[in-house]
């Protein structure tokens, strides 16, 4: 214990300094009425914390006055990951999910172009006006399916421009029947996911919120996960429930029903159909994202889960950034054959291998980085240089089987 004295404990981490991460730069697009002297529709706003949203007029009082969940979604996002950066653009309240994701529109496309590839993932949510009645199709608001198709078309167009950002769509107004639900695994949209998660404390706060889905919470947890990590990993950081903050004391779906209202068979069916919902695991307290499904088949598909896409997109970005200085550069050829000199090929291969070294260090890939430049390609004639890069990804243990039983040391046969 020592002699009586005044002891000093120097604390750290109290200044709220952020730990920025370029993987955790996300976008949020949602319908919400413009604010006089504050947030305007169609303008991109950078948000480093909920205080930046408050500064442009998006407050809890704004939500209450307009019967919407704009502040709520942003606040939940930063509650899940205070170190993330969120770029926000809003549309008029009349805009649908399909409108916001339209490839010729002025919302998601404008955000992605304005950020020039910095935004890595985008959440899209709808705050319908009072009186809105969804048209149900395939077990949900028909607007959801239309937005999924639009988002995939937009992803493909953006990919061609070297901007890589996947999509999370708000799965509004699930009709509560697993059998009637569309099989999302048949939609052929590997870069789009839908969240059907809902916090019943929010769903039940107003009739207009009955069909909402927790885009803010889900997007925040995706941003918190490493690119190779399932955002439903069963570790405390990814627990939807936070009793201290009153988050997800219970859990439900956008059907306005508790997850406990569904049988195990129903939940298994929804999981097999690619639905993201709050799951309960025996032996672990709280609720976790069921899985990181995309709207695409599992078989013969490398991109059936969100982390598959985030990993390959980061690898593409890093490799391209490393190789870009070679564009229009001089590549020496053998004066006798006209083919690239061996040392030129080896130098390019070393550059490609180094580009993914950080991902190996961070644990986002397993290794096996291999860059290959065919020494027999005729760059003199074609002006085209072909480079192949491969690596071994990390695996996710979705089904773990344990064989366990008694042993008897006296048993001889």
Where are these regions (language model features)?
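Anaerobic metallocofactor- and corrinoid-dependent redox/one-carbon enzyme cores
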Residues: 1-33, 250-274, 383, 387-389
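Small-residue-rich
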Residues: 1-186
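Catalytic cores of large soluble enzymes that bind and process phosphate-bearing ligands
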Residues: 66, 139-146, 307, 336, ...
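Compositionally biased, low-complexity/repeat regions
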Residues: 86, 91, 97-98, 366, ...
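Conserved, well-structured core segments that form the ligand-binding/active-site neighborhood
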Residues: 120-265
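Short glycine-rich, low-complexity/disordered patches
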Residues: 164-166, 172-174, 361-374
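Long, contiguous, structured domain-core segments that constitute the functional module of a protein
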Residues: 225-344, 391-413
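Short, hydrophobic/π-rich interface segment
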Residues: 342-366
